[in-house]
Amino acid sequence: MGYSKRFALYISILILIVMVAGCGKSDETKEDSKEEQIKKSFAKTLDMYPIKNLEDLYDKEGYRDGEFKKGDKGTWVLYSAIVSQPKGESLKSRGMILKLDRNKRTAKGSYIIRELKEDKNHDVQKNEKKYPVKLVNNRIVLVKDVKDKKLKNEIESFELFSQYGNFNHFDRNEITNISYNPNAPNYSAEYKMKKNDRNIQQLKKRFNLKTSKTPKLLFKGSGDIKGSSVGYKEIEIIFSRSKEEAFIMLTALSSFQVTK
């Protein structure tokens, strides 16, 4: 399998985890062009960051439509993962998905470690390990004990990007490469980050990234731009993505109904 197909497959696997509705309430008008709607959606998604106390989401209402059952407050889904592939190595990711049920006021999820590599026949082999976690007093707690002390500390000290990501400097006028496919429907837009961006420094420090490249911010979504009960909105901070190497931060912050 070629590099581009392999990487696309891997990203699609991650996206399947967060195929839920976009966050926040819509304020787009009928007069807005699709390009303007995408810009607004991009800005609104980034405006959610940071959420230092994740338990605040229990009292925050996300997107709602006619699919929600009466009385269902919904569930927030947060996902963050660093995807890396240093030159000559396999594709790996380490990250967490956390679901905050606003009805039960409980939060459960998993810390997930994945690796994709090609065998001698160029078939992709996937290795995955999941470690159940829960949120207690805004702290990540392992549901089952992990004997590896280094891994245990890594999991319990992990912070989702939504907790420390900060886009108060974001300029909507600098959004470029906006695309929209009405048949899917899906859409995307890019934002060139600056070298002194605090988010870049945070990611390099937290994940020991050794790249000097300035990343771009890629906003991707599917479904109605204004929000829907099916679809997703995702942010990728791409340091590099080529045949030689890949360093990408994936993050999603979305809300959806508990039952249909």
From Swiss-Prot:
Lipidation (S-diacylglycerol cysteine): 23
Gene Ontology CC annotation, any one: plasma membrane
InterPro entries the UniProt entry points to: Csa, Csa_sf
Primary site of residence: membrane
Keyword Membrane among UniProt keywords: yes
PROSITE patterns the record matches: PROKAR_LIPOPROTEIN
Coiled-coil stretches: none
Lipidation (N-palmitoyl cysteine): 23
Keywords: Cell membrane, Lipoprotein, Membrane, Palmitate, Signal
Membrane topology designation: Lipid-anchor
Protein's name in the database: Uncharacterized lipoprotein SA0401
